[in-house]
Design a protein with these regions (language model features):
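Alpha-helical substrate-binding/gating segment
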Residues: 175-183, 191-224
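Conserved Rossmann-fold NAD(P)-dependent oxidoreductase catalytic core, especially the SDR/UDP-sugar
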Residues: 90-132
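Conserved beta-loop-beta element that borders a ligand/cofactor-binding pocket
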Residues: 110, 143-166
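Mid/C-terminal beta-alpha module of Rossmann-like enzyme folds, strongest
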Residues: 204, 211-258, 292-295
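N-terminal Rossmann NAD(P)H-binding glycine-rich loop of SDR-like oxidoreductase domains
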Residues: 3-23
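NAD(P)H-binding glycine-rich loop region in Rossmannoid oxidoreductase-like domains
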Residues: 35, 39-91
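Glycine/proline-rich active-site loop of Rossmann-fold NAD(P)-dependent oxidoreductases
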Residues: 139, 151-153, 164-173, 207-217
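C-terminal amphipathic/interface module of NAD(P)-dependent oxidoreductases
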Residues: 262-296
Length: 296
């Protein structure tokens, strides 16, 4: 396959490009800087894209977007979170819809924040959108693929959970504290964490590319856990105690109340119903297996 990838320098994109290349696929990466071989230039802010490099595409994986937890949620950064997703997705969808030879599939990023805060309710792809800023962002983000769908391109919205990797993401940020024995449950610890290993994130994307799934696809492991369980499992994997709870006000001082309330102290109990029904087999279906694989 010839696969176009945006967000290729991020945690997921880097791993995906590596796997696609190892498997013998041709990969073109969209970048904002001066392109190197195997890359093409784009700028969603001004709507420019190097269409000459997009000929004969079989698939597009669109992962671009500002990091949800990279900054305090000021009004300006919240606008950046929304605009970086809406503009880039609209540009990708509109561009590939206008190609003479259209790709067969667009796999477009989304997040389980789509479902909002739902307590202990089990959520799958049939569950409705929730309320709140992240849910609103996800709804707008997914709607921006409409031009590609109208052009007859198969579109899958991958609603990704907490991606586990020792090299970054939520786990990477927590590891230093836990390695020093300073980790513990966050807030009440009762909030659900719907996680997925980086290996399965990439594996699930490849499964969607090769198959026939369309519409929303939850990219989470089939065994979500409460945050306190996650903390205990991580401490066990590292052979460190997890007796020090992290009160909510600590992260709020560093990251701001809205981000912490919406991301760290609120969770979703999400199940990958579409993937399981389509026959995807998880490499690391349990948290223990994922942490053992990652941390030894």
């Amino acid at each position: 396959m010839h696969v176009l990838v945006t967000g290729s320098s991020g945690l997921i994109g880097t791993a995906l490009v590596k796997k696609l290349s190892v498997d013998g696929h041709q990969v073109t990466r969209l970048v904002r800087r001066t392109p190197r071989p195997g890359e093409a230039r784009w700028n969603p802010d001004d709507g420019s894209i190097e269409t000459s490099a997009l000929r004969d595409l079989d698939a597009v994986v669109h992962l671009s977007g500002a990091g949800i937890a990279d900054h305090r949620w000021t009004d300006e950064y919240k606008r950046t979170l929304l605009d970086s997703r809406q503009r880039s997705t609209d540009l990708i969808a509109t561009t590939i819809a206008g190609l003479d030879k259209k790709p067969d599939v667009l796999v477009s990023g989304s997040a389980i924040g789509f479902y909002g805060a739902c307590g202990d309710e089990e959520l799958d792809e049939s569950s409705p959108a929730g309320s709140g800023f992240l849910a609103d962002v996800c709804v707008t983000w997914e709607a921006a693929t409409a031009p590609a769908e109208a052009a007859g391109i198969r579109v899958a919205h991958i609603r990704t959970g907490i991606v586990l990797s020792e090299h970054g993401g939520a786990l990477g940020k927590q590891l230093p504290l836990f390695k020093f024995g300073l980790g513990g449950k966050m807030g009440s610890g009762k909030q659900w964490q719907s996680w997925i290993s980086l290996d399965d994130e990439v594996g699930a994307i490849l499964h969607v590319l090769a198959g026939n799934l369309s519409g929303p696809v939850n990219l989470t492991a089939p065994t979500p856990v409460r945050q306190s369980e996650f903390a205990d499992a991580l401490g066990h994997a590292l052979h460190r105690p997890t007796v020090l709870p992290i009160p909510g006000f600590g992260p709020k001082l560093l990251l701001g109340g809205e981000l912490v309330d919406n991301v760290l102290l609120t969770g979703q109990r999400v199940l990958p119903a579409a993937l399981l029904a389509d026959g995807y087999v998880f490499a690391q279906p349990t948290l223990a297996s994922a942490l053992t694989h990652l941390l030894g």
